[in-house]
Amino acid sequence: MAHQAHSYHMVDPSPWPIFGAAAALLTTSGLVMWFHYNSSILLAAGLLSMLLVMLQWWREIVRESTFQGHHTPTVQKGLRYGMILF
C-alpha cells in the first residue's frame, strides 16, 4: 500500500479475520462435540488454531507499527482514544 498523506491508518487486506472466523467455528463445533460425545480433539484443534491466528495477527500489527511506520503519533492518539471509549 502506498504511503498516503492522511492522519488515519488504512490497513492492507488481511486473511486473519477469515482465519479467525474459521477458528471460532472450529472451536464452537469442538464444544458441541465435547458436550455431546465427550471428545475434546476438535475443541483442542479449534483452540490451538485460534491461538495461532491471534499470534500471527498480532505479529502483523507489530510489523506494521514498528517496521513499516504506519502508526504515526496521530494514529497512536486515535488508537488510545478508541481504547478509552471502548
UniProtKB/Swiss-Prot annotation:
Residues 1-15, 67-86 are mitochondrial matrix. One of its GO terms (cellular component) is respiratory chain complex IV. One of its GO terms (molecular function) is cytochrome-c oxidase activity. One of its GO terms (biological process) is mitochondrial electron transport, cytochrome c to oxygen. Component of the cytochrome c oxidase, the last enzyme in the mitochondrial electron transport chain which drives oxidative phosphorylation. The respiratory chain contains 3 multisubunit complexes succinate dehydrogenase (complex II, CII), ubiquinol-cytochrome c oxidoreductase (cytochrome b-c1 complex, complex III, CIII) and cytochrome c oxidase (complex IV, CIV), that cooperate to transfer electrons derived from NADH and succinate to molecular oxygen, creating an electrochemical gradient over the inner membrane that drives transmembrane transport and the ATP synthase. This is Cytochrome c oxidase subunit 3. The chain crosses the membrane at residues 16-34, 41-66. Keywords: Membrane, Mitochondrion, Mitochondrion inner membrane, Translocase, Transmembrane, Transmembrane helix. It is an enzyme of class 7 (translocase). It is found in: Mitochondrion inner membrane. Its EC number is 7.1.1.9. Gene3D superfamilies: 1.10.287.70. It comes from Anas platyrhynchos (Mallard). It is a multi-pass membrane protein. PANTHER family: CYTOCHROME C OXIDASE SUBUNIT 3, CYTOCHROME C OXIDASE SUBUNIT III. The keyword Membrane applies. InterPro entries: Cyt_c/ubiquinol_Oxase_su3, Cyt_c_oxidase-like_su3, Cyt_c_oxidase_su3-like_sf. The keyword DNA repair does not apply. Belongs to the cytochrome c oxidase subunit 3 family.
